[in-house]
Amino acid sequence: HGIVSFSLGTDTAGSGRVPAALNNIVGLKPSLGSLSASGVVPACRTIDTVSVFAMTVEDAFNVFTLLNDYDEKDSYSKPFKKLPLSLPQSSMKIGIPDKSSIRFFDDNFQAESFESNIDKLKSYGFEILPINFEPFYEIAHLLYEGSWVAERYTVIENLLKVNPKAVHSVTRQIIQKAKNFSAADTFRDYYKLSELKRKINPILTSVKMLCVPSIPTFYSVKDLEVDPITPNSNLGTYTNFVNLLDMCGITVPTDPRKDGRPGSITFLGMSGDDNIVASIAILFEKNCNRFLGGTKFKLEKPNDLQENNNSYLDIAVCGAHMEGLSLNWQLKDLGAQFVQKSKTSSYYNFFALTNLNPVRPGLL
């Protein structure tokens, strides 16, 4: 009904993005460690993150910004700067799967939708760079066929021993494969992941972000009743590798496909680039004609992003917070950017505030 503006989920292999694509909503998958996971039941704790579902990119990013805070109680929490949305540079290079490696599983409507979305990106002036996605698929394969399944086993090990029928039969079938892995297998998979990361690194350094289909195709409930494993595996084509590569991402609805099903596209960036992928998503959202989720409410066009976003304030500092001095790091940790050195006019006076410990400077 459009009453709820956002909800939280978790994302290990795409659970924060695939449902968003299927339901015409935004799915924001943050950088690993940026949102506290205290109290969250994990799937794979080392690569899990809390995710955000919302009707619009702006709502999703606002929730992310509020939740982005270091948590000392969460051993996987990391400190991240809170950076605002801003107008993306039109010279930005965006990587997409090339024609030889892109996968749609014979869904022509999905292929046409993605091609149309890429044409929009080109119209904004972005440089599109087709890349071979086979190494990404190899990494995705590790998540469910490799020893990360054993990490899932640690979460429900006791339940499987005491009451195995309490676990869905398909889930049980997948996770019980963990018994076949040894500690040596785990190290081999980590070595394999490092090798694939090395192979992919030149690709990722040649572009600012990736743009992929959120899902390669759609499946019905009936499809999943016949074969619950293959369709789910296919739905993770463009999601399963993301957390293993420590990337962030956002799934944003686009114009509906020609058959009426929801259109969608996903932007992926490196860790800490959450504001960049959200900024390009909101730019993309601005030029789409769609309803919000399952409602009949039309998307209201978001405000134009500015090069110098109004989330920034111009401030002048004196004393130890100046560039190169001992407290300047406090400003930088809050996302401050140095602009210029300057001098005060003769009307200003500089004071030592001796009643403070340590003594602080004052400028009037």
PLM feature segments, named:
Residues 342-364:
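Basic, polyanion-binding surface patches
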Residues 18, 105-106, 140, 220-223, ...:
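Short glycine-/acidic-enriched loop or helix-start segments at secondary-structure transitions
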Residues 6, 10-100, 115-124, 180-191, ...:
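Structural helix-boundary/capping segments
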Residues 75-80, 92, 97-101, 131-145, ...:
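Flexible, acidic loop-helix segments that line cofactor/substrate-binding pockets
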Residues 327-344:
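Short Gly/aromatic-enriched secondary-structure transition segments
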Residues 104-112:
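Glycine- and acidic-residue-enriched helix-capping/strand-helix junction motifs
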Residues 88-89, 98-102, 155-244, 286, ...:
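Serine-dependent amide/ester hydrolase catalytic core
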Residues 2-6, 207-210:
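Alpha-to-beta junction loops
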